[in-house]
Swiss-Prot record:
Organism listed in the record: Helicobacter pylori (strain ATCC 700392 / 26695)
Lineage of source species: Bacteria, Pseudomonadati, Campylobacterota, Epsilonproteobacteria, Campylobacterales
InterPro entries, per database record: FUR (IPR002481), Fur_C (IPR043135), WH-like_DNA-bd_sf (IPR036388), WH_DNA-bd_sf (IPR036390)
GO cellular component annotations of the record: cytosol
Functional description taken from the UniProt entry: Acts as a global negative controlling element, employing Fe(2+) as a cofactor to bind the operator of the repressed genes.
UniProt name for this protein: Ferric uptake regulation protein
Family annotation (SUPFAM superfamilies): Winged helix' DNA-binding domain
Length: 150
């Protein structure tokens, strides 16, 4: 999906958020955001930690979990719960999209479908509601897993 914001603008917002919350600026917070931004995919806390440890051997998984909680609370990242691969994280500064998640291998596919979006808007309008957000996840067995089970 197309990114809506540059890494530098996200990091600038992060610095302002850290200051607003009365916290000290931390290179590790910026590094977690950078890893997620550059990956362009959904990463586990372990994958994020492994990536950061390439530069900083002292990074702990517990620090990464604390940082992820802060980033999620401040809407810098989105969390995706999957049954196979646990919590996965992605940068929030992307165009709206939905997810297809394979229950067997944990593969995640992002997609955007204008027809689905239009239909959701029609449903909201029918009930005279105001759509704030939505998150669609479809749990499937991907093509590869179906073929390997035959």
């Amino acid at each position: 999906m197309k990114r809506l914001e540059t890494l530098e603008s996200i990091l600038e917002r992060l610095r302002m958020s850290i200051k607003k919350n009365g916290l000290k600026n931390s290179k590790q917070r910026e590094e977690v955001v950078s890893v997620l931004y550059r990956s362009g995919t959904h990463l586990s806390p372990e994958e994020i930690t492994h990536s950061i440890r390439q530069k900083d051997k002292n990074t702990s998984i517990s620090s990464v979990y604390r940082i992820l909680n802060f980033l999620e609370k401040e809407n810098f990242i989105c969390v995706l719960e999957t049954s196979k691969s646990g919590r996965r994280y992605e940068i929030a500064a992307k165009e709206h999209h939905d997810h297809i998640i394979c229950l067997h291998c944990g593969k995640i596919i992002e997609f955007a479908d204008p027809e689905i979006e239009n239909r959701q808007n029609e449903v909201v309008k029918k009930y005279q509601a105001k759509l704030i957000s939505h998150d669609m996840k479809m749990f499937v067995w991907c093509k590869e897993c179906q073929e390997s089970e035959c």
